[in-house]
Amino acid sequence: MGNSDPLGVCADFPIVADRTYLNSAYIAPIPRSVVAAGTEFLHNKSTRPLEVGELIGTDETLRAQFARLVNATPDEIALLFSTAEGENVIAQGLDLVAGDNVVVDELHYPTEFVLYRALEASRGIELRIAKHREGRVEASDFAPLIDRRTRIVSVAWVSHHNGFRHDMRPIADLAHAQGAVFYTDAIQAVGMFPIDVQASGVDALCCGSYKWMLAGFGIAPFYVSRALNERLKLDRFGEFQVDRELPDHHFELARTARRFDYCSRAFGAARELSAALAYLEQVGIARIEEHTVGLASRLYAGLSKQGHRLFTPPGNRSSIVTMYATKPMADVRAAFQAAKVDVTVRDGEVRIAPALFNTSDEIDQCLEVTRRLV
């Protein structure tokens, strides 16, 4: 693959020998080192099961790794099970009441709409939705919706719909000016480009690890700022929160983000994620961004030249490009499958997401398929 593999990572991903995989926005393949970590965990569970208990201590290593990745501190990191759990922790912990409102935009993930519609019905809150304009949602679109009764402003840092990458700081400033919490679902962002929770003004962030973080299912790092941590009420309890046992079955609970780690986690998934974060750190997130956003730009230009209508706005700085399909979905799927090119085809759209192991040649191969779909 020569110069088309500037990161030198293609050999780490066996899938590249079999097909052109441009679907990491759905599920990313994992590198060999992560496979090895997961295999080692399962082998030890089979042959030395009592040693699995020692993995509890490795949580602190994982917290430190993720904290470095997002410019936080380890005591601001909890280890949850899924992205959806993070926003539920925020929504339940703020004790929303009738008359409060939550502001999202229509490029957000479905979980948020399910959550806040349920809270509309059960607690009488109001869900306010900023509309997108040609695939973008700017701070100016949020501004009219945020007021003194806004408790949460929630966005997907990068939209799963079209890869739109929000300009976070202006939205954070609007939220904070009214005393609201700024939360982000970052599953389509962490691992794709450098994340700085301080510079962005994010109060809380959660992300599953099976997409751009190159790991498995069942673990989702959760960042919560110290200031917000002090405001959140706990809605679930268990032994993993305990800092100190007191007489007569009383307990002193952790005051750091570990207070949200209430029960045993998926230790195998945690081991895989630790290996994946080490891999990402070795390759370099900034280098990954330069390569993958470059591939996405090449793809965007090619699709535009072919005459496709694009849902992704021009100049967008993410690794996801979505085009509208004009042919029947069955025909579109068949065209990509015949070429052994994996993308997401659904709801009249084609989402294409190059990752660190993809090459410019593969983008050109994809464009050969889309040329036949004009």
Specify the residue positions occupied by each region the protein language model found.
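Pyridoxal 5′-phosphate
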Residues: 1-374
